[in-house]
Amino acid sequence: MKTKADFFRMKQADEPIVMVTAYDFPSAKLVEQAGVDMILVGDSLGMVVLGYDSTIPVTVDDMIHHTKAVRRGAPNTFIVTDMPFMSYHASKEEALQNARRIMQQSGANAVKVEGADEVVETIAALTKAGVPVVAHLGLTPQSVGVLGGYKVQGKDAESAKKLLNDAKQCEQAGAIALVLECVPKQLGAAVARELTIPVIGIGAGAEVDGQVLVYHDLLGYGVNRVPKFVKQYAAIQETIVEALANYIADVKLRQFPEPAHTFTMKEEEWVALYGGKQS
């Protein structure tokens, strides 16, 4: 399993870090088999696998449940788990309690928190307690209501300057990495240059230290609209629908199961059961 030190080394060597967001055992197993460096168990599971219209309803229990499944599928991969909405905002004590639960019960290697300002103090408190923290800036899904929806952040000089300053504060507070979402590529490159910790982009251009995409998005598997920053490397959903349609047709036509998929009883046992040949 790669460690925090490995990710710092990769940044220094200009070796891109590959991260995938996964939510369950089978996807995590395939992600690890493919050789991904890091897995994110994101609270986006609320929309991708639980059918919510945002990340807001996701709970700490949800995150623990899904991270445990991911850990079973990827025992040798560094896992980062999102702290969901309002699990680290009310007080540092609550943040510590929820982070402790996630780290102790789920098998995560680090937690991720969104935002800056007061969240920087939370990052510092968690770090002091020995919890590795990944920060998340730019488009922060837990704050889409405040941000005015799913929009590119840091497009003007003033907001870009604030974001860069926020990133530095997160690093100073002890964050081990930064996820930077949906910002202009120039800003993504600048943040990566200015920080010593790895900057992992999602819609932040190619000049950051790594990339993260959601498993379902990059495989073309899911019902949600795919953002502009996603490149789909497969069209699994079409394959699945076609396979299901073929299964339905075979059952309706009694072409499934075939002999290869059925079990038989010895003729003498069948005779003993019915007292005569019935087959």
Swiss-Prot record:
Q: In which pathway does it act?
A: Cofactor biosynthesis; (R)-pantothenate biosynthesis; (R)-pantoate from 3-methyl-2-oxobutanoate: step 1/2
The reply on keyword Metal-binding is: yes
Location (main, coarse): cytoplasm
Residues bound to 3-methyl-2-oxobutanoate: 43-44, 82, 112
Keyword hit for Magnesium: yes
Q: Which UniProt keywords apply?
A: Cytoplasm, Magnesium, Metal-binding, Pantothenate biosynthesis, Transferase
| Pfam family for this entry, one | Pantoate_transf
E.C. number: 2.1.2.11
- Residues binding Mg(2+): 43, 82, 114
Enumerate the CDD domains for this protein. Answer: KPHMT-like
Task: List the catalytic residues.
Answer: 181
Q: Which GO terms describe its molecular function?
A: 3-methyl-2-oxobutanoate hydroxymethyltransferase activity; magnesium ion binding
This chain's function reads: Catalyzes the reversible reaction in which hydroxymethyl group from 5,10-methylenetetrahydrofolate is transferred onto alpha-ketoisovalerate to form ketopantoate.
Q: Which family does it belong to?
A: Belongs to the PanB family.
Subunit-level organization: Homodecamer; pentamer of dimers.
Name of the protein in question: 3-methyl-2-oxobutanoate hydroxymethyltransferase
Supply the source organism for this entry.
Answer: Geobacillus thermodenitrificans (strain NG80-2)
